[in-house]
Amino acid sequence: MKTLLLTLVVVTIVCLDLGYTLKCNKLVPLFYKTCPAGKNLCYKMYMVAMPKVPVKRGCIDVCPKSSLLVKYVCCNTDRCN
């Protein structure tokens, strides 16, 4: 009986994902990293002249403003960048 109860508790914790954190792609989208506390956005940075080639990806707390040369795209779901 104790084993069954322990199993139910473990399954509940795994299913609820109590320690939810955001996952963002690294520069190569096959790899991702778990964002630290406070960094609740994923971002992708690329040069305006080459919009299909991202320069940097990762976690960030506030989305930076784009400029004439660099564009930032931010989102808040897992691996959205």
Swiss-Prot record:
GO term, biological process aspect, one: killing of cells of another organism
GO MF terms, alphabetically ordered: toxin activity
Bridged cysteine pairs (disulfide): 24-42, 35-59, 63-74, 75-80
Expression sites (tissue/organ): Expressed by the venom gland.
Stretch forming the signal peptide: 1-21
Oligomer status and interactors: Monomer in solution; Homodimer and oligomer in the presence of negatively charged lipids forming a pore with a size ranging between 20 and 30 Angstroms.
Protein name: Cytotoxin 4b
